[in-house]
């Protein structure tokens, strides 16, 4: 697919991640720089906020301002004016795990994964947080990534990046997962890894490619049908934005790139916008009460 690609913020993020569309603006993080960023497409304004630790995702809250965010120390509440407050600690600090990617389903449940911060073992898990508490839904994961839900709410997707595998699950109305199966298995002999994902309004999965200079759109059957090329090697996650949800925004990363590669791809670590024909799903909000 020959796409119109625009770098909307040449941020040079070390590890740009977690983009969401909220309040007609784009929010995302730089995990390693401990930053939360906010881009206003209508005006071009940009704002940045410091986090006290590695910050990995944001999710808006039903009936409230601010966000639920993942920090290395656990799940926190964040407001730009008042800062951070701890909601819950997820795992024992001795594991050296941290939250990674997250999504919110139509019922307001927060789904998030944890991973070993050094990317050295499979100590990560997948969790679901709702009004009843936090439940572990899957475990023994190397790098948790790409949680997202189909438009009908019946299929849940989740990726283990180091295993190069996107999994699908049946998702019940009560939030239980079953029938775990391989949705897409990436080739094991190269350096392209599936990273974050998002599902569009037709039920097709857009997956960012770490080491792959772009993203791929997969059909509900797992067939690759479209590819977008970006001028950055490590693409981390897409999200839909714009007034009609027909703009795909992508975060990227400079992490792991040599000086030679960075000189060849100076926009690595930037945020990119690409118009698409099929709209995304609205950003859901976390239900805390």
From Swiss-Prot:
Pfam families from the UniProt entry: SGL (PF08450)
Key words, A-Z: Hydrolase, Iron, Metal-binding
GO BP: L-ascorbic acid biosynthetic process
Annotated residues for binding of D-xylono-1,5-lactone: 98, 100, 119, 145
Catalytic activity: D-xylono-1,5-lactone + H2O = D-xylonate + H(+)
Cofactor detail note: Binds 1 Fe(2+) per subunit.
Cofactor dependency: Fe(2+)
Record-listed E.C. numbers: 3.1.1.110
Presence of keyword Cell membrane: no
Claim: Amino-acid biosynthesis is one of the keywords in the record: no
Enzyme class, first EC level, given as a word: hydrolase
Domain of life: Bacteria
Active-site feature positions: 195 (proton donor/acceptor)
UniProt record similarity statement: Belongs to the SMP-30/CGR1 family.
Role according to the record: Involved in the degradation of D-xylose. Catalyzes the hydrolysis of D-xylonolactone to D-xylonate.
Protein name per UniProt: D-xylonolactone lactonase
Protein source organism: Caulobacter vibrioides (strain ATCC 19089 / CIP 103742 / CB 15) (Caulobacter crescentus)
């Amino acid at each position: 697919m020959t796409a119109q690609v625009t770098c909307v913020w040449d941020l040079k993020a070390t590890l740009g991640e977690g983009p969401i569309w909220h309040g007609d603006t784009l929010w995302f993080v730089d995990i390693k720089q401990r930053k939360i960023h906010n881009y206003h497409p209508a005006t071009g304004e940009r704002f940045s906020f410091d986090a006290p630790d590695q910050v990995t995702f944001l999710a808006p809250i039903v009936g409230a301002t601010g966000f639920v965010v993942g920090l290395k120390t656990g799940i926190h509440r964040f407001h730009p004016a008042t800062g951070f407050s701890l909601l819950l600690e997820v795992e024992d600090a001795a594991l050296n795990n941290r939250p990674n990617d997250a999504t919110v389903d139509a019922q307001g449940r927060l789904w998030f994964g944890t991973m070993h911060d050094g990317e050295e073992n499979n100590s990560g898990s997948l969790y679901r947080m709702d009004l009843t508490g936090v439940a572990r839904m899957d475990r023994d994961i190397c790098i948790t990534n790409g949680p997202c839900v189909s438009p009908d709410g019946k299929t849940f997707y989740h990726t283990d990046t180091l295993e190069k595998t996107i999994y699908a699950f049946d998702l019940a109305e009560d939030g239980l997962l079953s029938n775990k199966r391989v949705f897409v298995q990436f080739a094991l002999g190269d350096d392209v890894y599936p990273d974050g994902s998002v599902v569009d309004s037709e039920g097709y999965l857009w997956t960012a490619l770490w080491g792959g200079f772009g993203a791929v759109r997969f059909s509900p059957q797992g067939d690759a049908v479209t590819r977008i090329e970006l001028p950055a090697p490590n693409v981390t996650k897409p999200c839909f934005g714009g007034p009609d949800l027909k703009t795909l925004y992508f975060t990227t990363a400079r992490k792991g790139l040599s000086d030679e590669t960075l000189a060849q791809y100076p926009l690595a670590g930037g945020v990119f916008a690409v118009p698409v024909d099929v709209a995304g799903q609205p950003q859901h909000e976390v239900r805390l009460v």
